[in-house]
């Protein structure tokens, strides 16, 4: 997409039920599919990106692959089609794409994500905690305790848990590379 191809305001209103899907958008976002060229800055690295199927996470996944990283992306199962589209771009960059559907707020799934990434990609160097949940309410008092909990489980607790799980395997992976002189 060139500058002249990009849509200009005013934009048509667009609403989607959670989770939003790129394939269902009226105006498709630019994740750098046609514009970003890498230069090998992440050659040989292994990355896990939560929410890597759309938005900023998708752009990061494509950029990291074009910089030379193998990329695992996590996403909600309803977003499979979006995830497959991003995997296509990772593969096209000559890198390995690993798709891990599930809910990051589930501690068992978080462990599964780290284990699969290490097992299938051979380690973990980079963790991008990109996935988030937010629901709009007109009035503060309309926010239910369940919505509040879901927001914190996804945006705070899951981030903490993934970092807690990733740090030991990342250090192990780093030490193994240092020992081999890589």
Where are these regions (language model features)?
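Catalytic Tyr-X3-Lys loop
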Residues: 133, 141-160
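The beta1-alpha1 cofactor-binding region of Rossmann-like NAD(H)/NADP(H)-dependent oxidoreductases
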Residues: 80, 101-114, 145
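A glycine-rich helix->loop->beta "capping" turn
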Residues: 93-96, 116-129, 135-136
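Non-catalytic terminal and boundary segments that flank Rossmann-like NAD(P)-dependent oxidoreductase
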Residues: 1-43
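Conserved glycine-rich Rossmann-like NAD(P)H-binding loop of the short-chain dehydrogenase/reductase
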Residues: 69-85
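Conserved small/polar residues in nucleotide/adenosyl-binding loops
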Residues: 172-179
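Canonical Rossmann dinucleotide-binding motif of NAD(H)/NADP(H)-dependent dehydrogenases/reductases
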Residues: 40-73
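Amphipathic alpha-helical dimer-interface segment in Rossmann-like NAD(P)H-dependent oxidoreductases
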Residues: 115, 119, 154-171
């Amino acid at each position: 997409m060139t500058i002249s191809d990009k849509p200009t305001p005013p934009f048509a209103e667009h609403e989607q039920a959670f989770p939003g899907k790129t394939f269902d958008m009226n105006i498709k976002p630019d994740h750098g599919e046609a514009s970003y060229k890498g230069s090998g800055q992440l050659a040989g690295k292994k990355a896990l990106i939560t929410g890597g199927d759309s938005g900023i996470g998708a752009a990061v996944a494509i950029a990291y692959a074009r910089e030379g990283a193998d990329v695992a992306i996590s996403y909600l199962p309803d977003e499979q089609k979006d995830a497959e589209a991003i995997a296509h771009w990772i593969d096209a960059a000559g890198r390995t794409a690993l798709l891990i559907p599930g809910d990051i707020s589930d501690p068992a799934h978080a462990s599964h994500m780290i284990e699969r990434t290490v097992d299938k990609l051979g380690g973990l160097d980079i963790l991008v905690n990109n996935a988030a949940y937010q629901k709009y309410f007109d009035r503060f008092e309309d926010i239910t305790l369940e919505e509040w909990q879901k927001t914190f489980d996804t945006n705070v607790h899951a981030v903490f848990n993934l970092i807690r799980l990733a740090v030991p395997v990342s250090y192990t992976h780093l030490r193994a590379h240092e020992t081999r002189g890589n």
